[in-house]
């Protein structure tokens, strides 16, 4: 993948850069109008003066140098004045412009491709890391961020970028290692796991009663549990009371009792052995599991719970990558595996091979390992990475 690289259209990035520059100018104009004066938007000191002294917004946090204008602070203020939302938008687009548009343009090699490097030993969990540049963190949460993917294209004119992504692989691993019958049943039946969990923690009779907000809360609980989240952490994430967050967590363990048993057992075994291990028996040593410092020990305990989950997910996609390359070689295909983004594999596919790839990639990924629940991989394709989503 490093040698092959992925083709990136500089013209698309340049056009996006022009579009973002216009948006930034418009936002600047609006912000200056509301502030009643021009100032340096990139200066926290000047921004703090405008927001908290001139516009009299309530200061939430102070630093050694003055008012904090961090994203966290601005998020809490955005309902109080439209200028705050515009400042947040400005920062977001400016970051995309500088980090991704300008940053990626500098990384395009003479062959028209970007050749990222993958580090196998940077993360403690075993996941691959992409550097020089990092192509695993192209933004997906904002429309402007997603646009960057339009520049990533196939190497042939009528070819495709093909993406195949494991569906909720960490939760499927959790269902497998914990042996929890209720969670396994949900995956075997093909239920939407977040809607299913919402049904359980809100004590509903049917998935039809689950609202989008309930599903969002259940999703935060599902993923939070994997990371050993506390009621305080969940309350902060969801903007709810600690009491309500505790109720969600208690209801979760009531509905999935074997997950609680797994967590207790994972900590106990880590104390006895000094390490946690993945389903492929790859170990992560945890010397801090016996620390006398509560915070240090608690982190090691959460790591004992989480490492077998995240680490096994990393093992699974690496096995899939090895098997996939063998399959491409065996069938003498010209398709190239060009990127790995956590639970997703991305391919550069000639038009003539698309039907073959649509069939074999999900098959190979879903059969990488055998779990007590099915592994599911979802495929999409298009004439660029943006359209393959």
Where does each model-flagged region fall?
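Short beta-strand->loop micro-motif that forms the acidic, two-metal-ion catalytic signature
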Residues: 344-349
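Conserved "right-hand" nucleotidyltransferase catalytic core of DNA-directed polymerases
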Residues: 1-143, 156-160, 167-170, 231, ...
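Amphipathic, well-packed alpha-helical segments that form the structural scaffold of globular domains
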Residues: 25-32, 52, 56, 175-178, ...
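Conserved catalytic core of nucleic-acid polymerases
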Residues: 115-116, 121-123, 203-333, 339, ...
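Conserved, non-catalytic sequence blocks in retroelement Pol enzymes and Pol-derived host proteins
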Residues: 41, 186-188, 309
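Function-dense linear segments that define catalytic or interfacial modules
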Residues: 120-207
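Short beta-strand
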Residues: 39-42, 336-341
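C-terminal polymerase-core module
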Residues: 22, 26-29, 33-85, 254-306, ...
């Amino acid at each position: 993948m490093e040698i092959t690289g992925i083709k990136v259209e500089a013209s698309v990035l340049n056009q996006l850069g022009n579009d973002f520059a216009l948006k930034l100018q418009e936002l600047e104009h609006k912000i200056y109008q509301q502030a009643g004066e021009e100032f340096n938007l990139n200066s926290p000191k000047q921004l703090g003066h405008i927001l908290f002294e001139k516009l009299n917004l309530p200061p939430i946090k102070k630093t050694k140098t003055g008012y904090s204008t961090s994203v966290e602070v601005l998020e809490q203020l955005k309902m109080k004045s439209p200028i705050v939302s515009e400042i947040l938008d400005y920062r977001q687009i400016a970051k995309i412009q500088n980090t991704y548009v300008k940053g990626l343009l500098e990384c395009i090699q003479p062959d028209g491709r970007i050749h990222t490097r993958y580090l196998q030993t940077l993360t403690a969990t075993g996941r691959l890391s992409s550097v020089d540049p990092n192509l695993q963190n192209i933004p997906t949460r904002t429309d402007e961020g997603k646009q960057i993917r339009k520049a990533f294209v196939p190497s042939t004119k009528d070819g495709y970028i093909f993406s195949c992504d494991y569906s909720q692989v960490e939760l499927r691993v959790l269902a497998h290692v914990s042996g929890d019958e209720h969670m396994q049943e949900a995956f075997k039946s093909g239920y939407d796991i977040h809607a299913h969990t919402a049904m359980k923690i809100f004590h509903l009779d049917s998935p039809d009663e689950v609202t989008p907000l309930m599903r969002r809360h259940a999703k935060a609980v599902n993923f939070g549990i994997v990371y050993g989240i506390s009621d305080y952490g969940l309350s902060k994430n969801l903007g709810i009371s600690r009491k309500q967050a505790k109720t969600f967590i208690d209801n979760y363990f009531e509905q999935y009792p074997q997950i609680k048993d797994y967590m207790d057992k994972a900590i106990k075994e880590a104390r006895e052995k000094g390490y946690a291990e993945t389903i492929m028996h790859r170990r992560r040593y945890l010397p801090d599991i016996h620390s006398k410092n509560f915070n240090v020990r608690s982190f090691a305990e959460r790591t004992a719970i989480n490492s077998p989950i995240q680490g096994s997910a990393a093992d699974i996609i690496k096995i899939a990558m090895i098997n996939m390359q063998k399959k491409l070689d065996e069938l003498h295909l010209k398709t190239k595996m060009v990127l790995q983004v956590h639970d997703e594999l991305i391919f550069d596919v000639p038009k003539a091979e698309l039907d073959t790839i649509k069939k074999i990639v999900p098959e190979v990924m879903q059969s990488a390992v055998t779990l007590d629940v099915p592994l599911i991989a979802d495929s999409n394709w298009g004439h660029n990475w943006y359209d393959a989503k």
